[in-house]
Amino acid sequence: VPRGPRFIAVLIAVLALLHGLPWLVLVASPGWSTAVTVIGSAVFLFAAIGFPFAMMRGHGRHHADRSAVAADAWLGIIWQFFVWSVLGGVATLVLRAFGVHGAARPVAVVVAVVTLGLLALGFQRAMRVPPARELDVVLPRLRPGLDGTRLVVVADTHFGPINRAGWSRRTVAAITALKPDILAHVGDLADGSVDQRREQVAPLATAPATLARVYITGNHEYFSGAAEWIAHMDALGWDVLHNKHIVVERGGDKLIIAGIDDLTAASSGQPGQGADINAALDGVDPALPVLLLAHQPKQVATSVAAGVDLQIAGHTHGGQMWPFHLLVRLDQKYLHGLSRHGDRTQLYVSRGAGFWGPPFRIFAPNELSVLTLRSPEAAGS
């Protein structure tokens, strides 16, 4: 991580803006009493100074989970206060232009109430067991024997500094109730090492599927050692699709399930890592339909070139915290849902089951994606 003067200057500017605007709208402008103004100013100053240190201690070499929890939570809180303070500041200026003065205090109250309400709702949505989002997907090359195959997708669990072992057990119970034929985890399993997150991941060993349980790496596995997570998921009984494929069969008909590494794998510096669609599909019968697990939606270009029938991705969290989706869309055109690409390929992007960093989901609900694969013959009957 850079530590030069330019980096320090940019960091100070970002922290000043992120904390300064909410301070201006909520504390300085409304004309509160001296005591309220002093206390409010002290809170924002302490947070602006303490936040980067907590972030470095939590996510740096110390990997101190308590510091990470505090820093991540504050990042989400101050982001929402910043966003709504921008809107509140604009509202105040518009009202002033129309001759309405003295709006700063009611605007501050509205900004505070809306922000705190959304944060409370967002925390509940982030920590809940993800609800099922069900969808039928017609695959033109799928044969009738595999019609009705239930593919349950769990993505972006991000087991991390907040111990969610109980959430993990309840989520596996929800998966069990969905009766998957194929259970797919499409990466970003955890933030941290296997030793740190073993308890949270353990319930996945009992998650059932009648045909296959398959897993691929996301970009976050490469922050803590992808090889260790690959070995651990293999030990839990999952098929790790590390640039490889398996064949599942039902009713005399077959489906290829392939997986490739995340886009960041090749640049991670970790031996043997890097997306390789040719290796993943080596020896595949070209007449068979292909389901590909690839963590990032923009890997769909690879899927189209390889003639994949359906790519399953995660990574985006649907934006996780409004309006962060606008920034995510700069990198990933497809944030969630089903889309078509080229003559054959379809892409489904899951909003994910968990959260990264701030424990909030605002206007981007979590989900267990339940895709019922349909053959055209059965779908048309």
Please name every model-derived segment.
Residues V138-S381:
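Soluble catalytic domains of enzymes that build or remodel membrane lipids, polysaccharides, and related
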Residues R105-A112, L116-R141, G160-G166, S224:
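Hydrophobic alpha-helical transmembrane segments in integral membrane proteins
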